[in-house]
């Protein structure tokens, strides 16, 4: 019997609170290791998707987002376009609207979804 082929999504973490996790010893927020996404967000196991991740290292404070980083996002998407059915960009909320606007022009001819999202709370909260 063949294994089912699930849709695949590339999760791109640029920075922002959504990609932080609380250090249990200090209570401080630290950058989350997205290689451990499924272990830390077990709800994702309910979906029939393959989720891979790419992280900006170090994470970008969204107030520092600029056109060169928009170009980097576009390159990541184009370099991985044939491997994934869609892309989710995790972004800081301060400048997400600017990035979304820029990417809407830079990626206007794509036939796959690109979703931007952020949060005021860290991942898993």
Could you tell me what each predicted segment is?
Residues 1-125:
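Active-site histidine-anchored catalytic micro-motif
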């Amino acid at each position: 019997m063949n294994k089912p082929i699930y849709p695949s999504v590339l999760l791109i973490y640029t920075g922002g609170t959504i990609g932080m996790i609380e250090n249990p010893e200090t209570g401080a927020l630290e950058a989350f290791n997205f290689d451990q996404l499924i272990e830390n967000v077990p709800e994702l196991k309910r979906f029939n998707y393959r989720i891979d991740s790419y992280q900006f290292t170090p994470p970008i404070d969204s107030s520092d987002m600029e056109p060169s980083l928009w170009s980097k996002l576009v390159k990541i998407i184009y370099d991985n376009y044939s491997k994934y059915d869609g892309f989710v960009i995790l972004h800081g909320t301060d400048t997400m609207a600017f990035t979304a606007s820029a990417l809407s022009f830079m990626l206007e001819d794509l036939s796959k979804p690109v979703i931007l999202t952020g949060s005021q709370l860290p991942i898993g909260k």
